[in-house]
Amino acid sequence: MNLKEKLAELKEQGLAEIKEAKDLKKINDIRVSLLGKKGPITEVLRGMRDLSAEERPKVGQFANAIRDELTQALADKKDEIEVIKMAKKLEKETIDVTLPGVPVTTGNTHIITQIIDQIEKLFLGMGFQVVDGPEVEEDHYNFEMLNLPQDHPARDMQDTFYITEKILMRTQTSPVQARTMEKHDFSKGPLKMISPGKVYRRDTDDATHSHQFHQVEGLVIDKHITMADLKGTLQLIARTIFGEDREIRMRPSYFPFTEPSAEIDVSCFKCNGKGCSVCKYTGWIEVLGAGMVHPNVLEMAGVDSNVYGGFAFGLGPDRFAMLKYGVDDIREFYLNDVRFLSQFSQKG
């Protein structure tokens, strides 16, 4: 019997064994016994050295074809056994679809994030852009660019977390506005932006103060901007957050980066302006600060204050949440008490 005949006989024997295999162990045993280093096919192939140079490649090609055929047959049989095994397993593990499902506990968006998202949605709909910036900020952008010279009281060490002499944790999100004004090309249109984010102050944590809290500051720069534009924008904020029937009033105030400046009150949403403990019986609740952008701030950003004007405002989502939901202690928002936070879960 020549080598080709031996190989053909081994192939038929191998295919028959593969066909009769019932489990994966048997498949592996056949693979090792047929195709392994000590298997019969390997032994036959060792006899190729006695063949002539003309016969050797023909027999080698024939042997490789048989090896490939057996390898494929082993793989097919393995897949067949695994399918049968899985079918038997599924048959034993029948699921009763009439049983009630297991409830899945889902997370909720934090109430402060909900307020910020609500504000962002409002302003994106008005064509504003939402701009982020660094929390570790330069003194230049946090103070100097906002009309706060070196000797201004707000720059006192007791109010600010200084990292180095010129680097600090931002005390407001206004530096984002200063950076954006520097880069904005006003020949392509006005600047309308809000800058939400975390800010830091050297405050002792108590019911109404925190060393870290949130701000959303807004800025509009264009030609012919007036106080009426500011008032209309603030009215929209108040009605979006606190209810459609809210009114606002503006009281004169002082901020270094705006002139004129105003404190903004909203008519009390608990008593509708009649007077209650929430509004301290005044009918009004202070909610934010605002004003027309100071010419010095425009000029320091490279904007011609004789051509352009604008308004700015700043509000605290933490305070908004406290007022809207009657929370007396700001620390409740940061204690990660799921029982407290789940009260504000969004449905649907």
UniProtKB/Swiss-Prot annotation:
CDD domains: PheRS_alpha_core
InterPro entries: aa-tRNA-synth_II (IPR006195), aa-tRNA-synth_II/BPL/LPL (IPR045864), Phe-tRNA-synth_IIc_asu (IPR004529), Phe-tRNA_ligase_II_N (IPR004188), Phe_tRNA_ligase_alpha1_bac (IPR022911), Phenylalanyl-tRNA_Synthase (IPR002319), tRNA-bd_arm (IPR010978)
Reaction it catalyzes: tRNA(Phe) + L-phenylalanine + ATP = L-phenylalanyl-tRNA(Phe) + AMP + diphosphate + H(+)
Coiled-coil region: none
Pfam families listed in its UniProt record: Phe_tRNA-synt_N, tRNA-synt_2d
EC number(s) recorded for this UniProt protein: 6.1.1.20
Entry cofactors: Mg(2+)
Similarity section: Belongs to the class-II aminoacyl-tRNA synthetase family. Phe-tRNA synthetase alpha subunit type 1 subfamily.
Description of how the protein assembles with itself and partners: Tetramer of two alpha and two beta subunits.
The protein's name in its UniProt record: Phenylalanine--tRNA ligase alpha subunit
Organism whose genome encodes this protein: Ligilactobacillus salivarius (strain UCC118) (Lactobacillus salivarius)
GN (gene name): pheS
